Design a protein with these regions (language model features):
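Gly/Pro-rich cap/lid or specificity-loop segments adjacent to the active site
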Residues: 22, 50-135, 142, 146-168, ...
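A short loop-to-beta-strand scaffold at the N-terminal edge of the catalytic core in hydrolase folds
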Residues: 22-34
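Short beta-strand element of the alpha/beta-hydrolase
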Residues: 39-49
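Alpha/beta-hydrolase-fold enzymes
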Residues: 148, 153-234
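Acidic catalytic loop of the alpha/beta-hydrolase fold
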Residues: 251-255, 283-288
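Short alpha-helix in the alpha/beta-hydrolase fold that links the catalytic acid
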Residues: 260-266, 275, 286-298
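Short beta-strand/loop motif that positions the catalytic acidic residue
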Residues: 273, 279-281
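Catalytic active-site module of serine/aspartate enzymes centered on a nucleophile-bearing elbow/loop
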Residues: 294-298, 302-338
């Protein structure tokens, strides 16, 4: 979490869906490429659950469909990820366990302020993203339907299913079982809880067949245990526990129909999406299964479902894991931007 090559957009005090105020809110973001005179080459990339603007760089390049030589790419960090306003960096009264509940709606309201006020952009050519980033693309398209021309969510959903919610409760419980967690009021990181969080999460990130066929060896792990230790270390070394839980709650409450605009009428929210849409689920994704996207695709007017078959599961989209997925992703981008 030490990549300082980014910009800050000051939002001031933000009233949240919950009614609480997020004080002195800020978004951390990074741009790539140049905004053209027509301002019609904008591609927005939100961040995924353990993502950052830096990790989003794996989804574009000069030889990729999203190309900084052609597009003005805005990579925006999720509230709670340690770069944008988060429990770890909030004002003292909202630091740590005192951080308010954040929804997807809140995130996209803030991102809209950045895009419109900082860059005076009125149209976004494409919003794309993996996992929670894809969830944000749906939210953008429902919240600001006249502004978003195309979305490409992959391994994501417009509403978190009950099964997905239960999965998240499991990793949450593993973290919070550490006595050092202390209801979020810890002086030192809850190491045991963070390790347990990573260890439990690893079982969901990949499919059963991924382990059965020992695909983890392609990642350089000789054994399952070595993979699990790596997941432990990643969460201990890179993530604040309160930050993880803030984003987890945002994920659990993901529903594009939250708020006064739709009053939890999910189908109406889907029907109101005007953006040209391609959804790419993975056949073996354990928490964003294709069935959820099949339902969504029935109600989004201009939508195509392109299910990708891979035993990598949810992590098929992690840059570098599956070259075939990268090819499918770039084709979808080109089809949406043609």
């Amino acid at each position: 979490m030490n990549d300082n090559d980014y910009d800050i957009f000051e939002l001031g005090n933000v009233k949240l869906v919950s009614g609480e105020i997020l004080y002195s809110a800020k978004l951390a973001y990074k741009t790539y490429g140049l905004l053209n005179k027509k301002k019609d080459n904008v591609v927005l990339l939100p961040t995924f659950y353990t993502g950052t603007h830096k990790r989003n760089e794996g989804f574009f390049g000069i030889n990729r469909a999203i190309n900084p030589n052609k597009h003005f790419i805005i990579s925006i960090n999720l509230l709670g990820n340690g770069f944008s306003t988060s429990p770890s960096n909030a004002k003292n009264t909202q630091k740590g366990a005192n951080f308010p509940e954040i929804t997807m709606w809140d995130n996209i309201w803030c991102q809209h302020k950045l895009v419109t006020q900082k860059f005076n952009i009125s149209k976004i050519a494409l919003i794309a993203g993996w996992s929670m980033a894809g969830c944000q693309s749906y939210q953008w398209a429902a919240q600001y339907p006249d502004m978003v021309e195309a979305i490409l969510p992959f391994c994501a959903s417009a509403k978190t299913s009950e099964h997905n919610f239960v999965f998240l409760e499991g990793v949450k419980a593993a973290l919070c079982a550490d006595p050092a967690w202390n209801n979020g009021s810890y002086d030192a990181p809850p190491i045991r809880g963070l390790k347990a969080f990573g260890r439990v999460y690893a079982g969901w990130a990949f499919s059963q067949s991924f382990f059965r066929e020992k695909i983890y060896k392609n990642l350089g792990f000789a054994t399952v245990e070595s993979l699990l230790v790596d997941w432990e270390n990643d969460h201990v070394n890179n993530w604040d526990a309160n930050n993880l839980l803030t984003k987890l709650i945002t994920w659990q409450k993901n529903d594009i129909s939250i708020g006064k605009k739709y009053n939890r009428n999910f189908i109406q929210a889907l029907q109101n999406i005007k953006a040209k849409t391609i959804i790419i689920p993975c056949t073996h994704d354990l928490y964003f299964p294709p069935e959820d996207n099949e339902f969504e695709a029935r109600y989004i007017k201009n939508c195509e479902l392109r299910t990708y078959n891979s035993i990598w599961g949810h992590c098929v989209a992690n840059p570098g894991n599956d070259k075939g997925f990268e090819t499918a992703l770039d084709k979808a981008v080109n089809d949406l931007l043609e």
